[in-house]
Curated annotation (Swiss-Prot):
InterPro entries, per database record: Acyl_CoA_acyltransferase, Bact_Acetyltransf, GNAT_dom
PANTHER family in the record: AMINOALKYLPHOSPHONATE N-ACETYLTRANSFERASE-RELATED (PTHR43877:SF2), AMINOALKYLPHOSPHONATE N-ACETYLTRANSFERASE-RELATED-RELATED (PTHR43877)
Domain N-acetyltransferase: 75-226
Organism: Methanocaldococcus jannaschii (strain ATCC 43067 / DSM 2661 / JAL-1 / JCM 10045 / NBRC 100440)
Gene Ontology MF terms: acyltransferase activity, transferring groups other than amino-acyl groups
Top-level class of the enzyme under EC nomenclature: transferase
Name of the protein this chain belongs to: Uncharacterized N-acetyltransferase MJ1207
UniProt keywords, alphabetically: Acyltransferase, Transferase
């Protein structure tokens, strides 16, 4: 027996696009999610039981996508000021917990680091806030001369997100903000270094279009051409 379902969805198109499926076929199951005029889900399967399982999985993903969408509507990204020092320090230590090789553990050095980032390129230093609460920072230095590229690049010295807000698009929004700033400054290359043991971060950057380059003393250089 074949079961066919056509379901019109009342979801924002942005959410639909994040879930879009184009002609998925596997083990007698066909799924299409089209986001053109009205989001519509098409499912063909062999039984009511498998249809229920597919719908359960789909709505679980839809709810997660809606959560991200609603969060994105509430966040703002602005330039960092000197008044953000305490929030930076608190979030910095929280975000790097478990990655002892990759951050300044003493508060005095973390404070110096914040001031150094401000001095390098204040206009490229951003904080993301959700309902007024800082949840992530990115520092993009467009005055940096890369020793390897032999030219000025947009160097992302730092990016971190509150662990409680990871997986919700905040990191992507911060990287996109840095890239937007880099383009404004006329840079064609965005460069960053990430610890070779930080596999999650490496995969995150790769999904955003960064390419793996050389490894130097335990740090992997990654590059995105814009």
């Amino acid at each position: 027996m074949r079961v066919q379902l056509i379901l019109h969805l009342e979801i924002p198109k942005e959410v639909c696009r994040s879930l879009e499926v184009d002609n998925y076929i596997n083990n007698s199951i066909e799924i299409n999610l089209k986001c053109e005029k009205k989001p519509t889900l098409y499912i063909k399967t062999h039984s009511i039981g498998s249809l229920k399982s597919i719908l359960d999985d789909f709505f679980r993903c839809q709810n997660a996508a809606m959560e991200v969408y609603n969060l994105i509507k509430t966040y703002t990204i602005r330039n960092v000021t000197k008044d953000d020092l305490d929030d930076f320090l608190e979030l910095y230590f929280k975000a790097y917990r478990g990655f002892d090789k990759y951050y300044y553990k003493k508060k005095k050095w973390a404070r110096w680091y914040f001031k150094w980032l401000m001095k390098r390129d204040e206009d490229g230093f951003f904080v993301c806030e959700v309902n007024g609460k800082p949840v992530g920072f990115v520092a993009c230095d467009c005055n940096w001369i890369s020793n390897i590229e032999k030219r000025e690049v947009a160097e992302i010295h730092e990016i971190f997100v509150d662990p409680d807000f990871r997986g919700r698009g905040i990191g992507t929004a911060l990287i996109n903000k840095a890239i937007e700033y880099a383009k404004k400054r006329g840079r064609r290359i965005v460069e960053l270094w990430v610890g070779v043991e930080n596999k999650g971060a490496i995969e995150f950057y790769k999904r955003l279009g960064f390419e793996e380059k050389e490894v130097v003393k335990g740090w992997l250089r990654m590059v995105k051409r814009i």
